[in-house]
Amino acid sequence: MDRVMKLASERAVVIFTLSSCCMCHTVTRLFCDLGVNALVHELDQDPRGKEMERALLKLLGRGPPVPVVFIGGKLVGGTNKIMSLHLGGELIPMLKNAGALWL
């Protein structure tokens, strides 16, 4: 859990993914298209990835454990939450408040 929280605070937006996950790619692409330089951490490329995956599952309280997005060091959620925030017009203000967007 400590490693997840440490990584989550390294940048304004941190996304935990799996390289083979299509929804992870979709969420990562959304942030890229918005102009956000997110830190993408692929759990299947990390020797401690399984341990972090379990920690993320514990934080979320449900599965699937990826993608998981942190904004401003705070857990926001997975695909459904990010898409809901985006469609509701709440994601961009959240990104601006975290310093991930300047426009």
Swiss-Prot record:
Keywords annotated in UniProt: Cytoplasm, Disulfide bond, Electron transport, Nucleus, Redox-active center, Transport
Gene3D superfamilies, per the entry: Glutaredoxin (3.40.30.10)
Motif (Responsive for interaction with TGA factors): 100-103
Glutaredoxin domain span: 1-102
Domain of life per record: Eukaryota
UniProt-listed PANTHER family: GLUTAREDOXIN (PTHR10168)
Role this protein plays: Has a glutathione-disulfide oxidoreductase activity in the presence of NADPH and glutathione reductase. Reduces low molecular weight disulfides and proteins.
Homology family: Belongs to the glutaredoxin family. CC-type subfamily.
Protein's recorded name: Putative glutaredoxin-C14
Organism: Oryza sativa subsp. japonica
